[in-house]
Amino acid sequence: MKYEPTESMKGKIEAVFTAVSEWYGIPLEQILSRRRDQHTAEARFVSIHLASKIPMAAWPSIGWYSNRHHLSCIYADKQVMEWKETDSKFAKRLTGVTEAVDPLLKPTDKPKKV
């Protein structure tokens, strides 16, 4: 595929999606599916939102992994930000899942000294 991410980036994105699926208690395959029920869609949107926080993660790479167009990923991210501002229960869920995923969002490569 045109925007296929590196193996390292694939692993990081998959780790975020897997952690979110475990937190929500639904299989990873369900998050990556075309299902549109509210629980699955929320988990998918949150996965995309948190994957965008990975250093050097690009929308096309996240879209490649989630089998979505990169514009759909941008929409998901914007929806999560809107829900966070307008729905206090969602904001609490987002905080919980973010705390669970946060260690995966840290850069793992140490900068090289020149």
Functional labels for PLM-detected ranges:
Residues W59-Y65:
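Short alpha-helical "recognition helix" segments of helix-turn-helix
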Residues F17, K84-P107, K113:
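Short Lys/Arg-enriched helix C-cap and helix-to-coil transition segments
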Residues A41-A57:
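Short, amphipathic alpha-helical "recognition" segments used to contact nucleic acids or chromatin
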Residues H69-I74:
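Helix-turn-helix DNA-binding helix
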Residues F17, A58-W59:
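Helix-turn-helix DNA-binding elements, focusing on the entry/boundary residues of the two helices
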Residues S52, D77, K84:
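DNA major-groove recognition helix of helix-turn-helix
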Residues E22-R44:
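Short, Lys/Arg-enriched anionic-surface-contact patches
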Residues M1-T18, K110-V114:
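General nucleic-acid-binding
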